[in-house]
């Protein structure tokens, strides 16, 4: 398949790499050369790690790289796409603008997928003239190693689109779980309030950062504590997702005060080297 990934950030780079390894032709699109260069470097780092671990033979890596096109040319990249995966910032208005633009640029038969973690697929589909071709494919970070993809069907998404999107995900060696088009879907609907309450435990002085994380590492056998996980996801992503959930589900999803403050200070977790932990 000819895949286009819109956005070369953490998620877009991972989706691009995984699609290349699966044998697809991939164009990754950014709006700024600096962001595009950063994305290319992330993709290159994935290949380097794969080679170092013996996961990918060098010949396969070079062949996969030959199928990558990195570009600032949105319309040109989308012209012959079979499937487009949007992976831009988690903001409904931003994504709607991208989908309206995709609708004009991509072939009429192309599937338009969003990597949104919480935003209504029906809403995004309404920004296009082909809502039956719009579907949610929520990948998890880091994409190359995480085996799950949530598939979200909008109110007008066709069964043919769902089937084709599922087949694409399966070529990546990942498992599909289906979710109704409800804000937050499965994972984030449950995960984000868990992280938010853990931050409130810290805000209220119930326990220390280290002990909160240790409690879930040892008491619930989690691989990562909730505060460390928030840093890994990105505090800006956690905050934006909670705001979307709050808009639809009410005050129980209101972001913790310290989370709002940290994001306003540019403390975004691992991506900015500062969050609940320093990196």
Where are these regions (language model features)?
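Rossmann-like NAD(P)-binding element
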Residues: 34-35, 51, 55-111, 119
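Rossmann-fold dinucleotide-binding core
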Residues: 111-180, 185-189
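Hydrophobic/aromatic beta-strand patches that form the interior of the parallel beta-sheet core
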Residues: 27, 69-71, 85, 135, ...
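NAD(P)-dependent Rossmann-like dehydrogenase/reductase catalytic/cofactor-binding core
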Residues: 8, 22-27, 159-163, 170-181, ...
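Rossmann-like dinucleotide-binding cores of NAD(P)H-dependent redox enzymes
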Residues: 28-62, 153-162, 176, 183-191
